[in-house]
Amino acid sequence: MPVTINNFNYNDPIDNNNIIMMEPPFARGTGRYYKAFKITDRIWIIPERYTFGYKPEDFNKSSGIFNRDVCEYYDPDYLNTNDKKNIFLQTMIKLFNRIKSKPLGEKLLEMIINGIPYLGDRRVPLEEFNTNIASVTVNKLISNPGEVERKKGIFANLIIFGPGPVLNENETIDIGIQNHFASREGFGGIMQMKFCPEYVSVFNNVQENKGASIFNRRGYFSDPALILMHELIHVLHGLYGIKVDDLPIVPNEKKFFMQSTDAIQAEELYTFGGQDPSIITPSTDKSIYDKVLQNFRGIVDRLNKVLVCISDPNININIYKNKFKDKYKFVEDSEGKYSIDVESFDKLYKSLMFGFTETNIAENYKIKTRASYFSDSLPPVKIKNLLDNEIYTIEEGFNISDKDMEKEYRGQNKAINKQAYEEISKEHLAVYKIQMCKSVKAPGICIDVDNEDLFFIADKNSFSDDLSKNERIEYNTQSNYIENDFPINELILDTDLISKIELPSENTESLTDFNVDVPVYEKQPAIKKIFTDENTIFQYLYSQTFPLDIRDISLTSSFDDALLFSNKVYSFFSMDYIKTANKVVEAGLFAGWVKQIVNDFVIEANKSNTMDKIADISLIVPYIGLALNVGNETAKGNFENAFEIAGASILLEFIPELLIPVVGAFLLESYIDNKNKIIKTIDNALTKRNEKWSDMYGLIVAQWLSTVNTQFYTIKEGMYKALNYQAQALEEIIKYRYNIYSEKEKSNINIDFNDINSKLNEGINQAIDNINNFINGCSVSYLMKKMIPLAVEKLLDFDNTLKKNLLNYIDENKLYLIGSAEYEKSKVNKYLKTIMPFDLSIYTNDTILIEMFNKYNSEILNNIILNLRYKDNNLIDLSGYGAKVEVYDGVELNDKNQFKLTSSANSKIRVTQNQNIIFNSVFLDFSVSFWIRIPKYKNDGIQNYIHNEYTIINCMKNNSGWKISIRGNRIIWTLIDINGKTKSVFFEYNIREDISEYINRWFFVTITNNLNNAKIYINGKLESNTDIKDIREVIANGEIIFKLDGDIDRTQFIWMKYFSIFNTELSQSNIEERYKIQSYSEYLKDFWGNPLMYNKEYYMFNAGNKNSYIKLKKDSPVGEILTRSKYNQNSKYINYRDLYIGEKFIIRRKSNSQSINDDIVRKEDYIYLDFFNLNQEWRVYTYKYFKKEEEKLFLAPISDSDEFYNTIQIKEYDEQPTYSCQLLFKKDEESTDEIGLIGIHRFYESGIVFEEYKDYFCISKWYLKEVKRKPYNLKLGCNWQFIPKDEGWTE
């Protein structure tokens, strides 16, 4: 139902309905009432400071602070007048309207409004509702003229206060009673929030947006609407009783350079979303899921038993039962009994936990947010006036398009939108610091380091060791995997999540049971003093700064001198640079000196060395050791040599203690004389084995992200600061030198200080790209070399034990496995002979780390210099070289990385490669690969098709370069040297085959070049080779144009995907590997190579009998096999079989099919196979009791007859790239009995005149045995492909 946001002024009179005097839960019957405003149903705002659990002196800044991991701002005068309270109220109304302005936000509000707490908690008997509970009811004071004041109870879902003592600390507070929380136990309870919209956090953007403008790594201030929505997600979790506040990530504080901070709850990681939930292991994910499911079952049990509301006899039991059924998405049978529908629960759970997240909302609202919950927070800023639409609007927030603020989130950028905020007074700012004091060399020198800047390293006790537990495996053991994703579009469009039942009355009897736990807040000391002789990253950063009151500074290469003397700044750049920077020049030489030193700065900052695969890192930034003293003193002097010896470990301040448990054993349940259950137990053990591998990998990734990658992140932050400090010192030196000249001398100096700043920032941006690549590569290298092998070692031990136990289990039960024991042993041996490969993208969605992992994991990708991929309705370069990609309007894109080029003038893609790539004479050693789909020729245009050539990709400069073109059934690769000499190599496919492997079908093209040869590989196999020894230098353009250019038909088009260029000649094995990787997918494909879809019409194609098709036999419920007609005009070119012939089948999803978020058919899905006949949907069945090896399939209208089976499992045909699949009939999804495979068989028929045999659409037990005997026999008649009608094939 539509959400209505109410409007108020603070001075509006109390009406006892929308404006009331409320006694909040923590007032505990003291008679402290607050003026409260109902901003929308069940949500109240109290424009007062949140004081519960605090002392009055807590509201003043002192030597102590509350949370040790943030900057805290105090102002005891905030909200101390009615005018200030009115501004707060109006601002909150505006923020709620901003939330409501988009469907996603309105749905969030709808679910909060309708997520009313259960009328009771764990103390209430099962058969009762009870409203006299502090987590359900609050009191309001009703006061009318001439009447005695009286209390009345009301139901509320959320009460929002102003802030507590700290203005920039926003928090959602749930209500505990005797140390139990309804918000965590399925019931849900009233939620409270302390919130301040004006003072917002600031974060930076060091890691993101390669190649973006120089402003893009400045500080960004948060959008208060997003801050509020973050808290509202906590509220939503609390109202549904799924708040996860008992699974902390605990910081390790063993060293003085580690953050001292409160534990981070899993609730925060789920609420933030993005990459952060990756820190929660898969087994923990599952335990949380199971706990919520168990709690919801408890609610079901209560609803089925509740008979009365003892605290309020006016409560209509049935109305509330119906409301709670709707809230929890329970189902009700004909007898009125409630139960949980697992699919509905699964959808609700995932929408709450993985759909509503800060990162999803930020993307939907186009708001800039932090990269991670762990991102550093900078001191907050005060937004000047959120009510001013020139500063902040309901539709766009700060990023107002009319003010050109929407690009790159300019409206949130501190450097750009300065009119939106003001810096806060340092007088009221408290920051928790570590004071590091030197006891030698520079005695008495202490530096203050903000706690936020220290290393966050999680303690190993933060992670569950559930993997070490033994597990019983039975025939019905369920999967533990929880897919932690919920597409945002599905969340917006899913009407099932919207309540269709009106809210019950909010009025009830007054609350008299004030049993509630009020949190008590204790202060912490603000500064911790440490004496140390270690020189850490923090001392080195401090040595690169200078006091603001000192202007005459100089650079030094001595770290100790920089600590001792405040006018000296440590520099890690070369001595030549330091000497030039410190050089004093005459006024006439000043401009030239400035130009030189600024250029030198850019050169120094961008120094990097390409290493020959040392420690799996191809790029190293050599000055990191000198800049931050990472590693140790010996590494500092020769960082590259030390790195070569020790690898990425040298960068870590703290080598983490890893939790890598011994994997617990499987206990296999025995079943007497039950073959099906025994086989199902074996299958479940093998499936659970994969889950153990996945869970172990997930545990390792969780520890890596929170113990290793956090250290590398701090190093990146440190290098960003170091480069900025170097730039600030240089700018100060330049300004000081300039200012000592006379006015006359200055007038003759032509210099632009803004230009200096711009060039320095540009140099820093370029350097940060190198640093990010280097540090990210080190982090992934540490994961792959130091962590994953330890996990694999434990997993292989587990596999060996499992294999032994399974083989013994088969031997013990061979009496019941007659005819199957050897096959089951073979299956176990095959399954356990290979390790499960590690894929980082399964465990985190951090695209930067995944990209680095992919580069690490493939020798090929380390040489890739252009890699076009789809993202957000555009093509981007994922090679890391940042090519500029312009996609014109006439190009069609889709999210399968495919793009379509037509003959239209604006159907074009322009790729401008990074100028850092040296691309001259590249033909001496380079490769190009891509997938292509070329449509079928037109029958009446065959001559043009054969003879006309058109270019599809062009990379030419001054008539030299390379191009790819098509002429008929030829793909042609052409090289042209600087003298105009041309060499070509081509691949030609046959168009006279009955069924072509290439026409309109995706195939993989790889072209390689070296000094001697140019080669073309198709689908991984070498097809053509040409000598190019006599060709000279080729100068290729840095610009690549994708466009159909030449003598072409106006309807001509092609499809392409996965275009890549490599700066090496790929080997045969490289190409085969790449073909196999890019061919693989989790879903099945149709005849053309596109995803196989549910609810789409297909003609069925038998790969073993290509010229056959299926037709419903007249007056008979069977499918006869007929021969495809042949098209041939006595042409030497045209010869093909019709594909669009026979019945058009439709794959329908069976209820428990895996793929529930889209219409793609995945491997092992359970399906129905249907088709339309006489405008009625028919289905493919098999008789339950057929006795022969083969039986004709029964084709009939859909029915519930128990004579037939209709459950089909659609399986991948082959491990190798293929578009074929097999259709396996089973009794049902739980059964291990394989009834037979769908295929073609010749049946004997007795005719009137003579006997004959005829082929029919059948189910076959023979195919089952043959597939096991020869699993990859291409000619088997049980291998099927599905042909949809396509614009690229006309008949």
From Swiss-Prot:
- List ligand-binding residues for D-galactose: 1240-1241
- Requisite cofactors: Zn(2+)
Q: Name one GO biological process term.
A: proteolysis
Positions that bind Zn(2+): 230, 234, 268
Q: Which GO terms describe its molecular function?
A: lipid binding; metalloendopeptidase activity; protein transmembrane transporter activity; toxin activity; zinc ion binding
The record's active-site residues are: 231
Map out region (Translocation domain (TD)) in residue numbers. Answer: 442-857
- Residues covered by region (N-terminus of receptor binding domain (N-RBD)): 858-1079
Q: List the disulfide bonds.
A: 437-446
Q: Where is this region: C-terminus of receptor binding domain (C-RBD)?
A: 1080-1291
State any further remark: There are seven antigenically distinct forms of botulinum neurotoxin: Types A, B, C, D, E, F, and G; new subtypes are quite frequent.
Protein name (record): Botulinum neurotoxin type B
